[in-house]
Amino acid sequence: MKNIEALIADGGDITIGAIHPIECAATAADSHNTVAALVRRDGETLSALLKRLDKAIGRFYVHDEIIDEVNGN
């Protein structure tokens, strides 16, 4: 989970929990912006969700691409 570790080391944060009406989502933000927002899939473990979040953060770092499943972007 090197990308999550790097984000937190740089002052960012991650959050896992409900975002009404979504039962479970994982979000990541740096000190300025949301860099990823993922919706937990049916049957997806928290471990798998965290791995997807780590990959999404990596895509932000490499390609400046924000993955936002919460808002449909």
Report the location of each language-model feature.
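N-terminal acidic leader/helix
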Residues: 1-27
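Amphipathic alpha-helical packing elements
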Residues: 24-68
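Short acidic DE-rich linear segments
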Residues: 69-73
